[in-house]
């Protein structure tokens, strides 16, 4: 670049910083420019691996959607617990008015320090979310759920009144305001969403999510969570087998999927994941129903091995570290760009 262009560029950069503040524009090589994306664990080792960066990206919008009782809130509560372990502050905007503090505590959430809001309208919920994000003091905000963000006009109107597109407009406007603040404050904002059926779809997937298309575009990560089976002990059902598909990922290659167990009253079975991934990576040997570790039998059947790992936390931690070393991305590994990894018509 010749000297005149350099001077013109420096003058323009100086003018921008003077008008909009320091850090409003910078070179990617400058100290303080964000290149590596911070992440927070989902509480599931397999899902952290599938996401490619070791968890959910901070400073981004994430959407988690699925049918009823599929594990959406459980997954977000695990993410809150992991953020609190890192010393972060968490907020839960409970538009559904259905948060169970006893269950949250069982999953490891510090409920005494969890900020909770139960707003009356969708506008109020999104204004509260925006205020929390702009404060820069909250590390993770959960909105549960998009379907429950009822516009004020609908609440104040009569039953049977038509309010076509109100919720979609509300979400679109809110996300335009939120996105820049989310990036600037490095806050992770997770929207939980529900599934609806499109009427008259003959071919293709009739499923869609509520709240219009804005959230699909603004989300850096979209997770589709489904219950695929039950975990039984005799006739008693202990939990659900769950599958999560990464349907959109702007920070790593998408379309990976992972399966794990959610146990009632306990949340994601970390020991179960360590067993499955340990067998896959040949750290645990499996012969018939018997499992062995370093040549020694550790149990017959998955339930017994799960209990063995609970009773022997040292072995559990060793296995977890070995699995992470093998499967987690290395810090200097090349990362894909947002443009290359944007969604390719999966909605």
Curated annotation (Swiss-Prot):
Q: Where is the chain membrane-spanning?
A: none
Which branch of life, at top level?
Bacteria
Give UniProt keywords alphabetically: ATP-binding, Cytoplasm, DNA damage, DNA recombination, DNA repair, DNA-binding, Nucleotide-binding, SOS response
Q: Molecular function (GO) terms listed? A: ATP binding; ATP hydrolysis activity; ATP-dependent DNA damage sensor activity; damaged DNA binding; single-stranded DNA binding
GO CC terms, sorted: cytosol
> A Gene Ontology biological process annotation?
DNA repair
SUPFAM superfamilies hit by this protein: P-loop containing nucleoside triphosphate hydrolases (SSF52540), RecA protein, C-terminal domain (SSF54752)
Q: Which InterPro entries match?
A: AAA+_ATPase, DNA_recomb/repair_RecA, DNA_recomb/repair_RecA_CS, P-loop_NTPase, RecA-like_C, RecA-like_N, RecA_ATP-bd, RecA_C_sf
Cross-referenced Gene3D superfamilies, in alphabetical order? P-loop containing nucleotide triphosphate hydrolases (3.40.50.300)
Q: Where in the cell is it found?
A: Cytoplasm
Query: What protein name applies here?
Result: Protein RecA
User: Main role?
Assistant: Can catalyze the hydrolysis of ATP in the presence of single-stranded DNA, the ATP-dependent uptake of single-stranded DNA by duplex DNA, and the ATP-dependent hybridization of homologous single-stranded DNAs. It interacts with LexA causing its activation and leading to its autocatalytic cleavage.
């Amino acid at each position: 670049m010749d000297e005149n262009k350099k001077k013109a560029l420096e003058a323009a950069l100086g003018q921008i910083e003077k008008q909009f503040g320091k850090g409003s524009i910078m070179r990617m090589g400058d100290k303080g420019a964000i290149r590596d994306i911070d992440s927070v664990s989902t509480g599931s080792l397999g899902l952290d691996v599938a996401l490619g960066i070791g968890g959910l990206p901070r400073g981004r919008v994430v959407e988690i959607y699925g049918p009823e009782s599929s594990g959406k809130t459980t997954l977000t509560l695990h993410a809150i617990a992991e953020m609190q372990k890192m010393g972060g502050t968490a907020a839960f905007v409970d538009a559904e008015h259905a948060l169970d503090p006893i269950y949250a505590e069982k999953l490891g959430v510090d409920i005494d320090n969890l900020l909770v809001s139960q707003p009356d309208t969708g506008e109020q919920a999104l204004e509260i979310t925006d205020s929390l994000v702009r404060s820069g003091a909250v590390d993770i905000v959960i909105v549960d759920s998009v379907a429950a963000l009822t516009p004020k006009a609908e609440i104040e109107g009569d039953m049977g009144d038509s309010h076509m597109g109100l919720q979609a407009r509300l979400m679109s406007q809110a996300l335009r305001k939120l996105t820049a603040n989310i990036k600037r404050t490095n806050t992770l904002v997770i929207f939980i969403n529900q599934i609806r059926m499109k009427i008259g779809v003959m071919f293709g997937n009739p499923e869609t999510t509520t709240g219009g298309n804005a959230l699909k575009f603004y989300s850096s990560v979209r997770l589709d969570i489904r219950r695929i089976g039950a975990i039984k002990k005799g006739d008693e059902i202990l939990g659900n087998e769950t599958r999560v598909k990464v349907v959109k990922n702007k920070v790593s290659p998408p379309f990976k999927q992972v399966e794990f167990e959610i146990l009632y009253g306990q949340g994601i079975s970390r020991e179960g994941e360590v067993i499955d991934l340990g067998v896959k990576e040949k750290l645990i040997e499996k012969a018939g129903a018997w499992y062995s570790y370093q040549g020694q039998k550790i149990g017959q059947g998955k339930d017994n091995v799960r209990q063995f790992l609970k009773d022997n936390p040292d072995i559990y931690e060793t296995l977890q570290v070995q699995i992470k070393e093998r499967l987690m991305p290395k810090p200097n590994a090349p990362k894909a760009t947002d443009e290359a990894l944007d969604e390719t018509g999966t909605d």
